[in-house]
């Protein structure tokens, strides 16, 4: 089955072609970072308009790259949520229009299920069951995964997601959008131990997260340095390192608890923050000590992309899941509501 995947949940237009027998044939992405950087964050209306502009040229690009023609496509998968409603509607409308014109099925895919399954595109994919850490700009969740659509939420953030905390903290200390990669870059030059940030909610049982207080702690630390005339580049690096260390250690502690609670020794990390090198190193060290394994997608498939949507949609289509031509998207969509395969 040859599936065209469309991703438009936020500020990246992703298109890919995935074949159930040959694997990923082509993948293309247009990032809107430059468009939104001047505003310090994503402007939903601008995001939607740019998706409209980029979608069809990217579809043509992946068809050319794969050496395919439209009549060879068996189905279309598109992100139906969660995400920005206007942006989601662009992908959904395009998918359903093409599906109607080509007389093929279209299926809406859960954005976070796409992230969750992205490591399945790699050479050594994880086997079920496993624990997944979904960590992005909009989500921080620990999920037990027994199969596609078989999800048990173990814990999640009670306020800011980890990726959101990265972006907001970066903005507070004067860094450009998107803040996560900027903090990671500066953290490499930071002096360890100069600042020590708290590890929120690690001193109590449970698998919930909270990052809003950590963001405030970073702001107060930066403000104190500014008031003392110590707000140079090295201080910015040191604050970035302390913040990143706090987030990484907090996530690692919670992942270890989740693995012990479930008795599992396979951990998948997915979502934009899973590209963070410090987080990967920390989780790899932790799993090595437990004689377990950690899995993640290559960096280009950690952030939003069409490949993960094409793959996730293909699995559901192969299992016989169907959907009518109604255009329906959801800004919020608990992953536990998805039907199991």
From Swiss-Prot:
The keyword Cell inner membrane does not apply. It is an enzyme of class 2 (transferase). It catalyses: L-threonylcarbamoyladenylate + adenosine(37) in tRNA = N(6)-L-threonylcarbamoyladenosine(37) in tRNA + AMP + H(+). One of its GO terms (biological process) is tRNA threonylcarbamoyladenosine modification. Keywords: Acyltransferase, Cytoplasm, Iron, Metal-binding, Transferase, tRNA processing. Binds 1 Fe(2+) ion per subunit. It holds the Pfam family TsaD. GO terms for cellular component: cytoplasm. Its main location: cytoplasm. Its cofactor is Fe(2+). Substrate binds at residues 134-138, 167, 180, 276. It is found in: Cytoplasm. Fe cation binds at residues 111, 115, 304. Belongs to the KAE1 / TsaD family. This is tRNA N6-adenosine threonylcarbamoyltransferase. The gene is tsaD.
């Amino acid at each position: 089955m040859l599936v065209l995947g469309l991703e438009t949940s936020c500020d990246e237009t992703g298109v890919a072609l995935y074949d159930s027998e040959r694997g990923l044939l082509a993948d293309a992405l247009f990032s809107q970072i430059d468009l939104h950087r001047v505003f310090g964050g994503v402007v939903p209306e601008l995001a939607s308009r740019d998706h409209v502009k980029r979608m069809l040229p990217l579809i043509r690009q992946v068809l050319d790259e794969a050496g395919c023609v439209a009549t060879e496509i068996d189905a279309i998968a598109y992100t139906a949520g969660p995400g920005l409603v206007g942006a989601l509607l662009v992908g959904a409308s395009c998918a359903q229009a093409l599906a109607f014109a080509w007389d093929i099925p279209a299926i809406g895919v859960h954005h976070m299920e796409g992230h969750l399954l992205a490591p399945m595109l790699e050479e050594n994919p994880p086997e079920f069951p496993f624990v997944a850490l979904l960590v992005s700009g909009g989500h921080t969740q620990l999920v037990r995964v027994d199969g596609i659509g078989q999800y048990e939420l173990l814990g999640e953030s009670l306020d800011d997601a980890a990726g959101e905390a990265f972006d907001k903290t970066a903005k507070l200390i004067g860094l450009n959008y998107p803040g996560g990669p900027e903090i990671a870059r500066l953290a490499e030059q930071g002096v360890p131990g100069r600042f020590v940030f708290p590890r929120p909610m690690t001193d109590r049982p449970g698998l919930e997260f909270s990052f809003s207080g950590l963001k405030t702690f970073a702001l107060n630390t930066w403000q104190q340095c500014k008031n003392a005339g110590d707000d140079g580049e090295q201080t910015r690096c040191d604050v970035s390192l302390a913040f990143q260390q706090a987030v990484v250690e907090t996530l690692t502690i919670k992942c270890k608890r989740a693995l012990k609670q479930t008795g599992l020794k396979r951990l998948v990390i997915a979502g934009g923050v899973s590209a963070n090198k410090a987080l990967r190193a920390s989780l790899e060290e932790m799993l090595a000590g437990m004689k377990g394994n950690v899995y993640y997608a290559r960096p280009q498939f950690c952030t939003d992309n069409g490949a993960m949507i094409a793959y996730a949609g293909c699995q559901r289509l192969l299992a016989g899941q169907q959907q009518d031509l109604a255009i329906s998207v959801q800004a919020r969509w608990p992953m536990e509501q998805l039907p199991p395969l």
